[in-house]
């Protein structure tokens, strides 16, 4: 059975980049002055991307997808019709400077599917409940995160800059709704109208059978940005598609630049011969 782990990770990278475009990165400033212009919030956030070293995330997905839109991936699992994604979650930590991450995901409605993915020291370790109880080892995946070299370029920042230019050129509009609380902290609430043409372009860029012929009909994006640091706090994306289905994705980012420990699994937890 083939599970498109790398495609999912690439999509996660695009989603995170879109979130940063909409609501910013770390400014490295303990207390930022009040900002009322949503475009300025976006600009200030994007310029602080290089200061982000580590971050924790919690994600949740609800809604349903049409199995036919997944191409061979859905057929390989023996599924058909709509698949409800309620209670699907993912959480983890990124150590950007070390190109390391640890992600745990769960999809209870699909045979209690769970996955644990660790990338550290140039290798990726993947454990999927439907496949086995041990990790498989492979070369590290290519994600838009920086290397540990002192003079390395923050790849995610380049992705953000490119997406920001695309958003501006396509007529995306940001509106400051007000202030909310996220993780017990004040946060700016910004809505961004993202043209569906741009969303479909990014989906198509993922490649593969699952992306072929997929069209998003409407999308709403809400972002929250921590007032004190201009770090992205929360993303909520709602997408509707006649071909794919209806999805709501919520992403919460916390624990910026706090120490994280990401380690490879013990040899006894890795498939023999790898």
Model regions and ranges:
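Sec-dependent bacterial lipoprotein signal peptides
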Residues: 1-21
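Subset-of-secretome marker
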Residues: 3, 23-274
């Amino acid at each position: 059975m083939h599970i498109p782990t790398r495609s999912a990770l690439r999509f996660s990278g695009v989603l995170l980049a879109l979130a940063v475009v909409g609501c910013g990165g770390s400014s490295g400033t303990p207390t930022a002055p009040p900002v009322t212009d949503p475009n300025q919030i976006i600009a200030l956030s994007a310029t602080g991307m290089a200061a982000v070293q580590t971050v924790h995330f919690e994600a949740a997905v609800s809604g349903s997808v049409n199995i036919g839109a997944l191409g061979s991936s859905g057929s390989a699992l023996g599924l058909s019709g709509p698949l409800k994604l309620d209670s699907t979650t993912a959480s983890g930590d990124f150590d950007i400077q070390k190109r390391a991450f640890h992600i745990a995901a769960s999809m209870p409605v699909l045979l209690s599917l769970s996955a644990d993915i660790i990338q550290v020291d140039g290798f990726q370790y993947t454990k999927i409940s439907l496949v086995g109880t041990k990790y498989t080892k492979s070369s590290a995946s290519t994600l838009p995160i920086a290397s540990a070299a002192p003079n390395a370029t923050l790849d995610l920042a380049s992705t953000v800059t490119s997406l920001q230019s695309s958003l501006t050129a396509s007529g995306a509009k940001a509106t400051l709704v007000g202030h909310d609380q996220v993780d017990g902290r004040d946060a700016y609430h910004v809505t961004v109208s993202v043209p569906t043409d741009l969303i479909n372009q990014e989906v198509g860029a993922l490649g593969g059978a699952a992306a072929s012929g997929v069209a998003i009909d409407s999308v709403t994006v809400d972002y929250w940005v921590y007032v004190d640091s201009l770090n992205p706090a929360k993303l909520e994306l709602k997408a509707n598609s006649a071909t794919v289905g209806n999805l709501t994705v919520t992403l919460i980012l916390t624990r910026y630049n706090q120490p994280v420990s990401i380690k490879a699994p013990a040899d006894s937890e890795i498939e023999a011969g790898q």
